[in-house]
């Protein structure tokens, strides 16, 4: 058996994640306009656009554990190929939908067959040495962030020149390229676990190194995504309330991008720091840091100040999801790592669905500032809970 160079796999998986992140961010910003172009009445555009976006996350949350079970049984590379090829059809096929019902149907299928990023994460986590998992998974996460930042620029340019449907064809091409790169260059010598040594899913949660931490890390993923997405629906409106009336969308986009760029810069650095001082320690510190920044955002007095705070916020996010992923990889047996990452993805998706609804509800009742206060409170509770859970482990670097 030849030794697999996990660093080579990391490079290819990073680029695959970049293409996947770009594909997602290419589609979402244009969804309301595309829904309108399909003939939906103006008063229903927001509803159907929201449905088209959320239905994908909901179906992904429901089916993610199934793909995790299959990945542990047949390998992570086949699941990456399956996701890439299936999403080539479901995302590229959006270019040909004749009405809103076909759009919703394809978005539903897209979520059902999604899973390139979590399987890429599980693949690298299963191959990288435990002591370098923070560095590797932190680096891997920057691929999605970089793609998410790049996507809207490419999409806007293509949409202006050739129309929105051409954007969907481009997305399909990106995902097909990700699948081809996986087929040709990703190396995985997967050895199925013998039946008598296989870990049933029911027993998996008790076979990890620290069973009580597993669900806690799942909940942490939920809170991280919930808090991040709760801001999305109100950010542009908050920027306007802070006095920005001209070029509102452009300025709002810059503020979003500032956080993305700082997150991309910090993820690799935070991953290395987590390997050096302990990912569990760094996770608690990063959550406490997030609470402070959310409170500062709630008291911002200008769009420039808000942008600065969001940039600073991004510097800490490199220790959040990558930190959770590193901890999951360290406490989980390799025979069950795909299932654990799949279940974690369920909580991540649910946070992405519930967060925007909660943020909008709080803003409607108490104003835009209140969303940041409420979000900081949620993260503070999660931070305190993690501190209690990790209290006996904070004395050691590795868990």
Language-model region placement:
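Juxtamembrane intracellular "pre-TM" segments in multi-pass secondary transporters
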Residues: 1-7, 188-217, 399
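Short amphipathic helix-loop junctions that connect adjacent transmembrane helices
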Residues: 30-46, 234-250
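Central cavity-lining transmembrane alpha-helices of secondary-active solute carriers
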Residues: 51-67, 257-269
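Conserved MFS/SLC helix-loop-helix module at the cytosolic interface between two early adjacent transmembrane helices
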Residues: 62-98, 274-280
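Paired small-residue
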Residues: 90, 101-109, 293, 304-312
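Cytoplasmic helix-loop-helix junction between adjacent transmembrane helices
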Residues: 106-144, 327
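Symmetry-related core transmembrane helices of the 12-TM Major Facilitator Superfamily/SLC fold
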Residues: 167-183, 372-388
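Helix-loop junctions on the cytosolic side of multi-pass membrane transporters
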Residues: 182-195, 387-399
